[in-house]
Regions:
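Helix-loop boundary and gating motifs at the non-cytosolic
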Residues: 17-68, 235-238, 242, 246-264
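Symmetry-related core transmembrane helices of the 12-TM Major Facilitator Superfamily/SLC fold
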Residues: 179-197, 391-406
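Juxtamembrane intracellular "pre-TM" segments in multi-pass secondary transporters
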Residues: 2-20, 201-239, 421-423
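Helix-loop junctions on the cytosolic side of multi-pass membrane transporters
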Residues: 195-210, 406-418
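Residue-level signature of mid-helix packing/kink "hotspots" within the transmembrane helices
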Residues: 68-76, 161, 279-287, 371-372
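Cytoplasmic helix-loop-helix junction between adjacent transmembrane helices
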Residues: 117-157, 345-346
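Helix-to-loop junctions at the C-terminal end of transmembrane segments
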Residues: 74-86, 171, 285-297, 382
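Structural signature of the two symmetry-related core transmembrane helices
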Residues: 89-103, 300-315
């Protein structure tokens, strides 16, 4: 017979301290999610050019196009699925999609397997990474969104960078396949197990925050949320276009940089180092820039970060020296650290809790569509004019996106604080 003690459920509260065990667990899980993507940062473009003999840059970057398109669509549906099925179930579904990926990369007999593996990786990343972001925001409440996002992205992209470094080192000793990809097998198994057995759903936290919102809102359809996030709300539009261009230049760097460095004559160990420095700097600084956006506001960090990214890309295109490329990678990491958590926090600020998960999924759709657009555009430009021209063109586009953000975005953190005080 149940007793009162057995029926008693733990109290639901918002905040990082109040939810630190689950928050810490989600940070660890996102590190494994990031590690799955890090497997590819150094290896896959070189597998295409060296093992499969691909000579077209556009064809080599096709794996990023498949990844970006599928991840963008997965992001788009992730918010809907999270609201309907619960965050935990969608997280587990993401890991299920990712389990075959390292095996496909190790055993791929031709390039079509690599493209298919990256489509599955896109599903996995779109669902699993989205859920770790959304669940942390659910747990943190409105006062610490920037810190929550910063810690999430820190864990994910630190794992991307360290895995890129590790796989580059292993590849220089053992070759491109299969030994460096064993890391991905471990990541997939551990991440799935943690998600199944230890994660708790956070919909009760959303209900608590929604109940304390300053004003009740009529339910919005997905189409209405899509329109608001894409173009109707000026802050959400500014964030969406900046996110798209941010990942556009990241997609370009993912596909073009290893080929660019290799063409100049760098070895796998040095290419791995350059590919690792950028996400490592990005990840570490997000611990600082996330909370700074809670204090200083989102807009200034986003605009300055986009312009710093543009400068770093231009420096890469104009130089032919490892030291300058290393400096440019550091600058690119700093700029991205300023932009990435601030954009997600800005979207959260401008979204009502009742449709925030869907708004974040729409933002992440546009942002990760940038991978596909960046890889395709950079590949076409590189085939026509060379690697340096492709990098410089994306630098110019990144600068223009910062201008659009400066003109369009209003400071979202001011609005968020006003809402907190009103409540």
């Amino acid at each position: 017979m149940p007793t009162a003690a057995n029926d008693r459920k733990p109290a639901i509260a918002l905040g990082l301290r109040e939810n630190w065990p689950q928050f810490t667990l989600l940070i660890l899980i996102n590190a494994f999610v990031g590690g799955m993507a890090g497997i590819e940062r150094t290896l896959v473009p070189l597998i295409g050019s060296e093992e499969f003999g691909l000579t077209s840059t556009t064809l080599v970057t096709s794996f990023i196009i498949s990844f970006g398109l599928v991840k963008a669509v997965s992001n788009l549906v992730s918010g809907q699925l999270a609201d309907r099925w619960g965050r935990k179930r969608v997280l587990i579904l993401g890991w299920m999609a990712g389990l075959p990926v390292p095996f496909m990369l190790m055993w791929a007999p031709d390039w079509s397997w690599i493209i298919a593996a990256n489509a599955l990786l896109g599903v996995s990343q779109g669902l699993a990474w989205s859920m770790t972001v959304i669940m942390k925001i659910d747990l943190a409440g409105s006062r610490s969104r920037g810190l929550a996002v910063g810690l999430n992205e820190f864990a994910g992209y630190l794992a991307v960078g360290l895995t890129a470094l590790a796989t580059g080192y292993l590849a220089s000793i053992y070759g491109l396949r299969p030994e460096p990809i064993y890391l991905g097998v471990a990541y997939a198994i551990i991440g799935t197990a943690l998600s199944v057995f230890l994660v708790r759903d956070t919909r009760a936290h959303v209900a608590l925050e929604t109940g304390g919102a300053t004003a009740a809102q009529p339910p919005l359809s997905f189409g209405q949320v899509f329109a608001l996030t894409s173009y109707k709300d000026r802050n959400l539009f500014a964030a969406s276009q900046a996110g798209l261009v941010n990942n556009l230049n990241d997609g370009m760097s993912w596909g073009i940089f290893p080929l660019f460095y290799s063409a100049i004559g760098l070895g796998l160990d040095r290419i791995g180092l350059l590919k690792a420095i950028y996400p490592i700097v990005w990840s570490l600084l997000q611990i600082i820039t996330g909370p700074l956006s809670d204090r200083w506001g989102r807009k200034g960090l986003i605009v300055a970060g986009m312009w710093l990214q543009a400068a770093a890309l231009l420096l890469t295109a104009l130089t032919r020296d490892f030291g300058w490329w290393l400096a440019a990678s550091v600058l690119l990491g700093i700029g991205t650290a300023m932009v990435y958590p601030s954009l997600i926090a800005a979207v959260s600020d401008a979204s009502h809790p009742s449709w925030r998960a869907r708004s974040l999924s729409v933002y992440r759709f546009w942002r990760d569509l940038g991978y596909a657009i960046g890889a395709l555009a950079a590949g076409l430009i590189a085939d026509a004019f060379g690697f340096a021209a492709a990098i410089a063109a994306i630098a110019g586009l990144t600068f223009l996106s910062g201008v659009v953000t400066a003109i369009t975005m209003q400071e979202t953190r001011t609005v968020s604080r006003a809402n907190e005080h009103a409540s």
